[in-house]
């Protein structure tokens, strides 16, 4: 069915945010998300079957869907996409044919965080550093979670945006204090090259805690990043000091990225760690450390605002924005 016919028949967009364990789906109608559902990837041999089941659950016909955008964890190229943390494979041609689609767009999952940053409302953001965003400049999106995602969002005018994904999580971890250096040495002994992601991720938080305990002669009481965070929230001094150091390192890495990209449009923090410990993050030294550096670079960063993204489904929203812009570009 051609695009015009399907749209005249009430064609809808469908968006998905697919991780290793769960797949989140929603309809994209009138530039808004509707009918959000979460399905377990393990329950479906193929992603097409998950889409069909999602539509059946919400009482929507496959025939009414003309466009799909899926956020996928990993680098997205022109070839088939193989998920690294589950058994699914997306063959673009087969996927389009089975579901009768006119458009199929696959985007990197962290890129959707950047797309989402162009559309989030005030109730989906918490400002953690004051400043004045420049509307015509790039925005930086950074998110420690399973790894350390980094990307930027460029305004093109007319409400259009371009997302520039990168591998900023793999820059060298900056060392600016004796404690930094001691922790860095512990990371180097484990991994060799010490990227920012080695510290600023879930595994990184646990590694920093274990190394910190060894340096200070303190017994290790946590075996996961979640447990480190729980200890910190319960008042454990060692875990709390590690969480503080994590936030300070994030400030330096984010500040360096702003200097590199020229992201005077502001910084948006996402990922699974900072929003979980938002009150502790606000109370940390992040805001001061972000611009605490040399005279020239510190002045450049002084007025850059920082927000934490607290939207419940930013990946789905970002996929919807990416799909909408692609369709609008086609006319």
Swiss-Prot record:
CDD domains: ASKHA_NBD_GLK. GO terms for molecular function: ATP binding; D-glucose binding; glucokinase activity. Its main location: cytoplasm. Its EC number is 2.7.1.2. Keywords: ATP-binding, Cytoplasm, Glycolysis, Kinase, Nucleotide-binding, Transferase. InterPro entries: ATPase_NBD, Bacterial_glucokinase, Glucokinase. ATP binds at residues 16-21. Gene3D superfamilies: 3.30.420.40, 3.40.367.20. It is found in: Cytoplasm. It is an enzyme of class 2 (transferase). One of its GO terms (biological process) is glycolytic process. It catalyses: D-glucose + ATP = D-glucose 6-phosphate + ADP + H(+). GO terms for cellular component: cytosol. Belongs to the bacterial glucokinase family. This is Glucokinase. It comes from Pseudomonas aeruginosa (strain ATCC 15692 / DSM 22644 / CIP 104116 / JCM 14847 / LMG 12228 / 1C / PRS 101 / PAO1). The gene is glk.
